[in-house]
A protein has these predicted regions:
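Short, positively charged
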Residues: 1-33, 40, 44-228
C-alpha cells in the first residue's frame, strides 16, 4: 500500500513517503527519514496496524543495568538477588520496579539495611540506570522523581524526559503520531505535552522497561494511538 511505500529507505518509516507526496509543502528531510513541513522539522511515527513506536533506539546491555543494581547491593540485597546477571532475564517496567521493589524494600522516608537514606538511594539507582540510556541532564531529572511516593509521577517524568532526549538527539521541532487504521493524528511539541497526551488518552502505552528482558529498545517509552 502507499502508506508502506519507501519504508526503510534512508531510514524512512511507514507513511513518510506517502505524506511527502501529498503536498509540495511536505518534503523528506535530506539524508534521513524525517519530514520537513513548511520548513519545520517533523518526526513522524506512523501506526499502520497494532502497536506504535518507541522514542528511541539502541539502549544499554542488560548486564550493564544489573551491574548498577549490584553497586547498591548492601542496600537492596533482595532486589539484586531477583535480577540475576544474564544477556536475557527477568525484567520490570518503571511502575512495577517502583511499586513491587523499591516501595517494598526501600520505602520513602526509611533507612536501608546498610543504614542509608532510602529516598537518596532510590534517586541514585534511578539516575544511574537511566544514565545508561539517556545520559545527563535527562537521567538526573528522571532519577530525582524516584524520590516521589507516587509512581505515576516517576513514569510521567520519564516519558517527558525521554521525549526531550529524543527531540535533542534527532533535532526535530514537532512530533507527530498518526494512525492510518483509526484515522487519528496527535501532535506533540515538548515533553510535558507528551506526558499529558498519555494522561488524557490521546496516546496509549507509555510503558518502558527499567530493567529490560534482553531487548534494549524496551528502555524507551512506547506510544500507540487508541483505536476509535
Amino acid at each position: 500500500s502507499l502508506m508502506m511505500y519507501g519504508k526503510g529507505q534512508k531510514r524512512a518509516g511507514a507513511g513518510e513517503f506517502a505524506l511527502a507526496m501529498l503536498s509540495p509543502k511536505i518534503k523528506m528531510a535530506a539524508g534521513q527519514g524525517d519530514l520537513v513541513i513548511n520548513g519545520v522539522n517533523v518526526e513522524l511515527k506512523a501506526e499502520t496496524t497494532q502497536g506504535g513506536g518507541r522514542m528511541g533506539s539502541g539502549g544499554p546491555a542488560r548486564n550493564d543495568q544489573i551491574k548498577v543494581l549490584q553497586k547498591y547491593a548492601e542496600h537492596i540485597p533482595e532486589i539484586v538477588e531477583y535480577f540475576q546477571e544474564g544477556v536475557t532475564g527477568k525484567s520490570a517496567n518503571i511502575t512495577s520496579f517502583l511499586t513491587n521493589f523499591l516501595d517494598k524494600y526501600l520505602p520513602i522516608g526509611g533507612t536501608s539495611p546498610a543504614g542509608g537514606n532510602n529516598t537518596q538511594i532510590r534517586q541514585a539507582i534511578g539516575t544511574d540506570i537511566f544514565a545508561l540510556t539517556f545520559g545527563q541532564p535527562y537521567a538526573g531529572i528522571m532519577g530525582k522523581a524516584f524520590g516521589q511516593a507516587n509512581a505515576n509521577v516517576s513514569k510521567n517524568t520519564m516519558i517527558a524526559q525521554n521525549y526531550e532526549w529524543y527531540k535533542a538527539k534527532d533535532d526535530f521541532s514537532l512530533f507527530v503520531v498518526i494512525s492510518f487504521k483509526s484515522q487519528r493524528l496527535t501532535m506533540i511539541k515538548n515533553g510535558d505535552e507528551m506526558a499529558e497526551a498519555f494522561a488524557n488518552g490521546m496516546l496509549s502505552g507509555g510503558g518502558a522497561s527499567f530493567i529490560h528482558s534482553g531487548q534494549s529498545t524496551e528502555c524507551f517509552a512506547q506510544m500507540n494511538i487508541p483505536h476509535a
